[in-house]
């Protein structure tokens, strides 16, 4: 990750609306964004689009998730894969993640197989303000509200809206990466 970002400053856990101010451009035309004494002509916003516009058309609905982790010291292989999805109606969780398979189950120092395992079950949760929004709720009512926000977004020439929350659209990860690369190519004229 460090090589990917290079010299790009990254700040985590920062509330965009509190940390970034939109101010008039020195040229007198349009606006720029200011953060920590630095100005930016354009920003990429991947947060909730309704929150960006201060919920002026009302809040959009989102789904959230909750996670329960369990350490299984006597089980070396719980499911044989990093992620197994569960789509059955009678199963309360949507997936189980077995973390050791992301690192191939080897101790980083010794290279020996790791004894035991840790799993995390992912459960759907109703989203409320203050919770992490994971997915948009794309129904007729929310999509109509989103279209109003989208019209405002098109007027903000110095903001690129992206991701599930910024575009209020469900994306699988491969699709969001493709959409991000396409948006970057369009923005950079390549």
Feature roles, as predicted:
Residues 2:
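Active-site phosphate/pyrophosphate- and oxyanion-stabilizing loops and adjacent acidic/basic residues
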Residues 5-20:
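A conserved beta-strand/loop element that lines the FAD pocket in flavoprotein oxidoreductases
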Residues 11-15, 99, 162:
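Conserved beta-strand termini and adjacent loop/short-helix elements that scaffold enzyme active sites
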Residues 21-152:
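Mid-domain catalytic core of redox enzymes
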Residues 57, 171-174:
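Short, solvent-exposed loop/turn segments at secondary-structure boundaries
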Residues 153-169, 176-180:
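Short FAD-binding loop at a beta-strand-to-alpha-helix junction that anchors the flavin cofactor
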Residues 177-190:
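Internal hydrophobic alpha-helix adjacent to the cofactor/substrate pocket in enzyme cavities
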């Amino acid at each position: 990750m460090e090589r990917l970002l290079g010299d790009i400053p990254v700040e985590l856990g920062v509330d965009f609306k509190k940390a970034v101010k939109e101010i008039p451009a020195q040229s007198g035309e349009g606006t720029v964004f200011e953060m920590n004494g630095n100005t930016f002509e354009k920003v990429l916003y991947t947060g909730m689009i309704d929150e960006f516009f201060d919920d002026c058309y009302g809040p959009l609905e989102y789904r959230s998730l909750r996670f329960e982790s369990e350490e299984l010291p006597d089980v070396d292989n719980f499911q044989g894969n990093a992620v197994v999805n569960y789509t059955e109606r009678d199963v309360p969780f949507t997936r189980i993640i077995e973390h050791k398979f992301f690192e191939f189950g080897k101790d980083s120092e010794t290279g020996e197989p790791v004894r035991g395992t840790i799993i995390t079950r992912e459960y759907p949760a109703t989203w409320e303000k203050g919770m992490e929004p994971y997915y948009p709720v794309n129904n007729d009512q929310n999509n109509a509200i989103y279209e109003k926000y989208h019209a405002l977004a098109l007027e903000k020439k110095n903001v690129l809206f992206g991701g599930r929350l910024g575009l209020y659209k469900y994306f699988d990860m491969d699709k969001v990466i493709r959409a991000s690369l396409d948006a970057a190519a369009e923005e950079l004229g390549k």
